[in-house]
């Protein structure tokens, strides 16, 4: 009996490890026309979520079912996009890039699986190429690598200026984009299941508050990414903080602390190689002490300002790539979280309904069942029958109907 149970278990593990090998019916690349995304000649809306952990869990074949569950639950609710990490740098468990130019093949196959499974189930991916923060390596790891090779660096923001570090980043871009998926046999740069790349998660450069250093880096790296991969859309990974190019917005919309981070929402997105604008709305992080009414008022001003600027100045789509309300926020209630989701979605829908620049919203964050080790204050399990999940599903339904109406 024990032997039979072991054989059955082994068969399940093997089956799970090969989920996603069969490709779904062919699907096109997401492109853009003015302020709208286009898929197979029709308008496309980015309704989705963040799940940074996908490649990490997919590195172990016995836990790949978690990726399958999340994608299946997402599509059952009408969600279309998952935003996830395409990096994990340094001497950490399940690192992707263990040293400059050195990659762990098992971890890379985890990312292969995520892409293959997204393709099979019908999810588009937005993949980030490095982190601003120290988590999972980030720009600090790149700077440490350079220092170990004798480079004179004084801060983590030398990531943007040091030529050796910039070459490390470019090599990572080439390695990831040219990677041939071991499941689908398709190079990432040729894979339609990938919607877009983002240069960095939440780029900031505090040592140069003028914004010039970060702007120079984007001006160099965005065309470089496009030279390697002209098929996919590209954005910055920006939080949406305004800079010196729009002083009125900077003074009226930015959290005060954001005025020193060297980012510029308008300038950083106003180049040809950047296809769409990115913003986040971390009202729970930026304004811990706001009451609910004040929080919702800020969200309205923040989103409507960026949507207006994407429409009239950038003339590109804008994605709200992170939003939510953490349970660790002072005076948190589920009703308050639902209020944040409802207000956010209503503003996105109002723009999309008019053919405006708001192309979708991705909440932070989704986890799968049984992932208590990854659970955070903002984690949502899509299979839960919570009021928040109902709001997510209803918004996806409305945006889907809007897309169908627009296509006629």
Swiss-Prot record:
<keyword id="KW-0732">Signal</keyword>
<dbReference type="GO" id="GO:0000272">
    <property type="term" value="P:polysaccharide catabolic process"/>
</dbReference>
<feature type="binding site">
    <location>
        <position position="85"/>
    </location>
    <ligand>
        <name>substrate</name>
    </ligand>
</feature>
<feature type="glycosylation site" description="N-linked (GlcNAc...) asparagine">
    <location>
        <position position="73"/>
    </location>
</feature>
<feature type="active site" description="Proton donor">
    <location>
        <position position="202"/>
    </location>
</feature>
<feature type="signal peptide">
    <location>
        <begin position="1"/>
        <end position="23"/>
    </location>
</feature>
<dbReference type="GO" id="GO:0016985">
    <property type="term" value="F:mannan endo-1,4-beta-mannosidase activity"/>
</dbReference>
<keyword id="KW-0325">Glycoprotein</keyword>
<dbReference type="InterPro" id="IPR001547">
    <property type="entry name" value="Glyco_hydro_5"/>
</dbReference>
<dbReference type="Pfam" id="PF00150">
    <property type="entry name" value="Cellulase"/>
</dbReference>
<feature type="binding site">
    <location>
        <position position="201"/>
    </location>
    <ligand>
        <name>substrate</name>
    </ligand>
</feature>
<keyword id="KW-0378">Hydrolase</keyword>
<feature type="active site" description="Nucleophile">
    <location>
        <position position="322"/>
    </location>
</feature>
<dbReference type="InterPro" id="IPR017853">
    <property type="entry name" value="Glycoside_hydrolase_SF"/>
</dbReference>
<comment type="similarity">
    <text>Belongs to the glycosyl hydrolase 5 (cellulase A) family.</text>
</comment>
<protein>
    <recommendedName>
        <fullName>Putative mannan endo-1,4-beta-mannosidase 4</fullName>
        <ecNumber>3.2.1.78</ecNumber>
    </recommendedName>
</protein>
<keyword id="KW-0964">Secreted</keyword>
<dbReference type="GO" id="GO:0005576">
    <property type="term" value="C:extracellular region"/>
</dbReference>
<feature type="binding site">
    <location>
        <position position="364"/>
    </location>
    <ligand>
        <name>substrate</name>
    </ligand>
</feature>
<keyword id="KW-0326">Glycosidase</keyword>
<dbReference type="InterPro" id="IPR045053">
    <property type="entry name" value="MAN-like"/>
</dbReference>
């Amino acid at each position: 009996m024990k032997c039979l149970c072991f054989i059955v278990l082994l068969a399940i593990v093997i089956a799970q490890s090969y989920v996603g090998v069969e490709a779904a019916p062919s699907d096109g690349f997401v492109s853009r026309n003015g302020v709208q995304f286009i898929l197979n000649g029709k308008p496309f809306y980015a309704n989705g979520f963040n799940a940074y952990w996908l490649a990490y869990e997919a590195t172990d074949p016995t836990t790949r079912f978690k990726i399958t569950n999340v994608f299946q639950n997402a599509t059952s609710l009408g969600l279309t996009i998952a935003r996830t990490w395409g990096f994990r740098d340094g001497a950490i468990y399940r690192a992707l890039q263990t040293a400059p130019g050195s990659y762990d093949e098992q971890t890379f196959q985890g990312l292969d699986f995520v892409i293959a499974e997204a393709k099979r189930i019908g999810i588009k991916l937005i993949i980030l190429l490095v982190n601003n923060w120290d988590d999972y390596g980030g720009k600090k790891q790149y700077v440490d690598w350079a220092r170990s090779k004798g480079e004179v660096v004084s801060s983590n923001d030398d990531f943007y200026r040091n030529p050796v570090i910039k070459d490390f980043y470019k090599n990572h871009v080439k390695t990831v984009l040219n990677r041939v998926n071991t499941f689908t046999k398709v190079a990432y740069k040729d894979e339609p299941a990938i919607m877009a790349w983002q240069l960095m998660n939440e780029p900031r450069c505090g040592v140069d508050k003028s914004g010039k250093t970060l702007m120079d880096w984007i001006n160099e790296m965005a065309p470089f990414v496009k030279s390697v991969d002209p098929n996919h859309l590209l954005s910055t990974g920006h939080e949406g903080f305004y800079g010196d190019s729009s002083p009125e917005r900077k003074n009226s919309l930015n959290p005060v602390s954001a005025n020193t981070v060297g980012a510029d929402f308008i300038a950083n997105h106003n180049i040809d190689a950047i296809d769409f604008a990115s913003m986040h709305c971390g009202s729970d992080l930026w304004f811990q002490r706001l009451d609910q009414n004040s929080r919702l008022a800020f969200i309205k001003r923040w989103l409507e300002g960026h949507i207006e600027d994407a429409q009239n100045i950038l003339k590109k789509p804008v994605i709200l790539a992170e939003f939510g309300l953490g349970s660790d926020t002072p005076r948190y209630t589920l009703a308050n979280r639902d209020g944040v989701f409802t207000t956010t979605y209503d503003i996105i829908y109002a723009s999309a309904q008019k053919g405006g620049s708001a192309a979708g919203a991705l909440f932070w964050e989704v986890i799968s069942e049984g992932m208590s080790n990854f659970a955070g204050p903002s984690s949502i399990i899509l299979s839960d029958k919570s009021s928040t999940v109902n709001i997510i599903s209803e918004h996806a339904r409305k945006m889907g109907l809007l897309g169908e109406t627009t296509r006629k």
